Each structure stands twice: as C-alpha cells, then as structure tokens.
Amino acid sequence: MAKVKTSYVCSQCGYETSKWNGKCPNCGEWNTFEEVELAVRAGGAKSKPTTVRDISDKIVGIDDVDASYNEIRYATGLKELDRVLGGGLVKGSLVLLGGEPGIGKSTMLLQICQYLGQDHTILYVSGEESVRQIKLRANRLHVDSENLYLLADNDCEQICSVIVKEKPEIVIIDSIQTMNISGISSAQGSVTQVRECTNMFMRTAKSEEIPMFIVGHVNKDGAIAGPKVMEHIVDCVLYFEGQRNPVSYTHLTLPTKR
C-alpha cells in the first residue's frame, strides 16, 4: 500500500528537502519552497534484489560512430528560427519555447505547421484549447495541411503513449504548464508536475527520435514558470519576446542551447 511523502521543492532551482526553508541553500533565493506530496511504497516488504544488466556490448569506438544521422534537420520555414536552431529541428530534440501569454507562441507554431506539414506528419497537442478552437485559429492563419493532426488532452502519460503508437514525425505540446501526471498529487503547473512532465516528454523524444516543441509561459519576473531545472532538461530554450508600445514587434532570443 502506498503512503504519502511530503517534501519541499525550490521553484527556482528544483532543490528538494524534507523541511521548509525560508532561503534556498542551493540558489540563495527567498520564499521559493513549495510543498509537494508524492505517493511512495510502504516500507513493510523488502524489495527484490535488482539484476544488473551487462551493457558492455554497447561500448562503441568514437571512430565507428556514424554521426551523419544526427545532421538530419527539419527546416521550419522561418529563416530566423532556423538560424537560431542551427539549421532546423534535430531528430529527438526537445525545444522549449517561452514567452508571455498572448505574445504569439501558438500562432508561430501553427505557421511552422503549415510549412512542415507539406512533407511531415505533425501532432499538435493542446491542454488549453479544444480541437475546434485550434481549427478556427488555423483557419484565420490560412493553415491547411492534411498532415496536421490535433489532440486536446493534458494527461502526459496518455499523450506519450499516443506518440509512441502513432509515431508522428514532429510533436508540439501547448503548453507544459497544463500537462499533468496522474500519479503526482500536486496541481497542474506546480514545480513537480512541470519538471516530471518535461522529463517524460524528453524521454519520449529521445527514445522515438521525434523532435518536439513545448510551450512554456513566463511569469511576472520574465522567467519561464516552473523550476529552473526544466531549462536544463531540454536541448534548447527560446524566448519569444515583444513590445506593443510605442511600436509593436516581436523577436526570438536564445539564452540556452546545448
């Protein structure tokens, strides 16, 4: 039988402790700890010994590695975006697109779908809008592609299962703050949910070799809502910034890329 374990996680750096602290000992920020509850196994029964797998056969000499496959990139159709991505989307990469709500993140991603959908299958997953709302917005942007598929859901485990089964060539998650894992008791958008959902999407992207865009909203301080460790989980972080007064414009910045 599972029991509930309570811990505290820093919303800035992801540092976890069993007791609440006013100041995070890892990043030095004040009042950033949030209480989270996790279901853990009761310690009554002894666990079975784990069998260690022999992975020595996976060792490969560096001269024997075929690196040409990793050079395959999907051009997005947006010249500046392709430039900051080093030529386009890499297979198996996870790109975090952050920005204020309403700045145009979803609009830009639908425009990318219009271009990429000519030759590639795309799964657009929304936890914020219904498929009808996405369709109406796509109509306003004149986005029409028979290779674009829509899914309105926020269950991270179910979404990853669909990705593995259907095997789309490109996936868009809009947004990470609306996703959740049922086994975690904390609310959507919490430190634990955002971190673990990001980890799950990353594992799926790598195992299936599918590039993914995930949308992340920024908070009032201009940082992507959720733990800072999320930015270190993904392969690339893009900030979509803009100014409405006196002149309206938007631009992409690339603070992190690995």
Regions found by a protein language model. Name each.
Residues 1-23, 28-37, 41, 176, ...:
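Cys/His-rich Zn2+-binding cysteine-cluster or related metal-binding knuckle/ribbon modules and their
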Residues 5, 16-95, 119-124:
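Detector for small/aliphatic-rich hydrophobic stretches
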Residues 21, 212, 237:
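N-terminal, positively charged regions that mediate nucleic acid binding
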Residues 92, 100-103, 110-200:
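Conserved inter-motif catalytic segment of the P-loop NTP-binding fold
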Residues 172, 211-216:
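Structural recognition of the conserved hydrophobic beta-strand(s) that form the central parallel beta-sheet
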Residues 193-213:
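Substrate-engagement module of ASCE P-loop NTPases
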Residues 229-239:
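A short helix-turn-beta junction within AAA+ P-loop NTPase domains corresponding to the substrate/partner-engaging
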Residues 250-256:
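Conserved small/polar residues in nucleotide/adenosyl-binding loops
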